[in-house]
Swiss-Prot record:
GO terms for biological process: anaerobic cobalamin biosynthetic process; methylation. Its EC number is 2.1.1.195. This is Cobalt-precorrin-5B C(1)-methyltransferase. The gene is cbiD. SUPFAM superfamilies: CbiD-like. It catalyses: Co-precorrin-5B + S-adenosyl-L-methionine = Co-precorrin-6A + S-adenosyl-L-homocysteine. The keyword NADP does not apply. Pfam families: CbiD. The keyword Methyltransferase applies.
Length: 362
C-alpha cells in the first residue's frame, strides 16, 4: 500500500461529538437513530454510525466505534460512548451543558496540559465540539434544564497503559483529543503533540534541565545516571524518539535553558551527521561521514579501515573497544548540531552503551 492511498480516520474527539449528537437527537425526538452527521472544525461534513443505543425518559446514550483509518493508533476500534441525562436546573438558572468523563477516561494530575489539574482529560476542542452539536440539536427548543454529558471508553484504562498518558500525568484512562477531528495516516503529529505536552508539563512542574532520549533503553540509562527521584524529577525525562530536530526546536521556543540528549551510538551518529529526523535509512552515508572525521585525527586514524568495512555504527563502536576518542568525536558533533538549533541553551550528551552503561557524558 502506498502512502498516497492511505485512508484518514477520526479522532476520539470527533467520535465523542458524534455520539453526543446522536444521544441528543434521541432525547429530543424520543426515538432511536442509527446515524448522524457532524461538521468537523475544518468544515468537513462527516457521517458516523451509532451503536449500543439506549433511550429513556430523560436519558439517552450511544457509542461510536473509532476508525483511525490506516493510522496505527492504539485507540483504533475503541468504543467511544456518550450518555446524556437531563436534570432540573436550579431556580433562576438557564440551561447548561456539563461535560465530564466516566469509565476509561483519565484525569489530569500534573500542570502544563491544555486541561487544568483535577479535570477530566477531555481537551478544549472536543469539549467545544460536544457543546456545539448539542446546541444545534436543541436550537429551536433551547437546551433543556441541566444536561449532563458523560464520555466513557469501556476498555480505556487498559488501552491507556499502552500510551504515554501516565507519564504526562493523565491517570486512569485515555484522553479525548483532536483539533481538526481527523487522524492523518502514519503522520508524526501524535508523537510531536506528545513531545509538546511533555515539555509543557516538565516546565510547569519546575524542571530546569530536560533529558531528551531517542528511545526507552537510553532513557533508562539516563534515569539511573541522573538519579531519577533524587536529583532529577520524572517529568524532566522526555521521549523524543526519532524527532530530534523537532524536540530541540520546541525546547528553544519554550525557553528551555539546559538540555541533555540521551541516545545510543547509532542514533547519535545520525544526529551528529545533521539528521533532524533519525528514522532514515542512511547507515552507509553515516559511516562515510564518520570515516571523514576519523581520518585526519591521528588518535582515530587507525579506525578508518574498521569504519569502512563495518556494516553498522554499532559494529564500529564495539570493535573499537568503545574507543573514547571515537565516542567524543561523535558526541561533540551532536552538541554542535543541537547548539545550532537551541542557541541559548546549555547542551550535554549522554551516550548509552548497548550493555545499558554510560559510555560518555558531557
Amino acid at each position: 500500500m502506498t502512502r498516497a492511498f492511505l485512508r484518514s480516520g477520526y479522532t476520539t474527539g470527533a467520535c465523542a461529538a458524534a455520539a453526543a449528537k446522536g444521544a441528543a437527537e434521541m432525547l429530543r425526538d424520543g426515538q432511536v437513530i442509527d446515524r448522524v452527521e457532524i461538521i468537523l472544525p475544518g468544515g468537513e461534513l462527516v457521517p458516523f454510525t451509532l451503536r449500543n443505543q439506549q433511550l429513556g425518559d430523560k436519558f439517552a446514550s450511544c457509542s461510536v466505534i473509532k476508525d483511525a483509518g490506516d493510522d496505527p493508533d492504539i485507540t483504533n476500534g475503541a468504543e467511544i460512548n456518550v450518555s446524556l441525562t437531563i436534570e432540573p436546573a436550579p431556580p433562576g438558572t438557564k440551561g447548561e451543558i456539563a461535560v465530564s468523563g466516566g469509565t476509561g477516561i483519565g484525569k489530569v494530575t500534573k500542570p502544563g496540559l491544555a486541561v487544568p489539574v483535577g479535570e477530566w482529560a477531555i481537551n478544549p476542542v472536543p469539549r467545544k465540539m460536544i457543546r456545539v452539536v448539542i446546541n444545534e440539536v436543541f436550537a429551536i427548543r433551547c437546551v433543556p434544564s441541566l444536561m449532563k454529558v458523560t464520555v466513557s471508553i469501556p476498555n480505556g484504562e487498559e488501552l491507556a497503559k499502552k500510551t504515554l498518558n501516565a507519564r504526562l500525568g493523565i491517570i486512569g484512562g485515555l484522553s479525548i483529543l483532536g483539533t481538526t477531528g481527523i487522524v492523518k495516516p502514519i503522520s508524526a503529529k501524535a508523537w510531536t503533540d506528545t513531545i509538546d505536552a511533555a515539555i509543557d508539563v516538565a516546565l510547569a512542574c519546575g524542571s530546569k534541565t530536560l533529558i531528551l532520549s531517542t528511545g526507552r533503553t537510553s532513557e533508562l540509562v539516563a534515569e539511573r545516571h541522573l538519579q531519577l527521584g533524587k536529583l532529577t524529577q520524572e517529568e524532566a525525562f522526555i521521549m523524543m524518539g526519532d524527532h530530534v530536530g523537532y524536540a530541540l526546536k520546541t525546547c528553544a521556543a519554550k525557553g528551555v535553558r539546559e538540555i541533555v540528549i540521551a541516545g545510543q551510538f547509532a542514533k547519535l551518529l545520525k544526529v551528529a551527521c545533521g539528521h533532524e529526523q533519525t528514522h532514515v535509512s542512511s547507515s552507509e552515508l553515516d559511516l562515510q561521514q564518520l570515516v571523514s572525521w576519523l581520518g585526519p585525527d591521528p588518535r582515530t586514524s587507525g579506525l578508518v579501515l574498521l569504519a569502512r568495512r563495518a556494516n553498522t555504527a554499532r559494529q564500529v563502536l564495539e570493535e573499537s573497544g568503545n574507543d573514547p576518542v571515537l565516542m567524543a568525536a561523535v558526541c561533540e558533533r551532536v552538541k554542535g548540531f543541537a547548539a545550532r538549533l537551541v542557541q541559548e541553551s546549555s547542551i550535554k550528551v549522554l551516550l548509552a552503551g548497548y550493555g545499558q552503561e554510560v559510555l560518555y557524558f558531557g
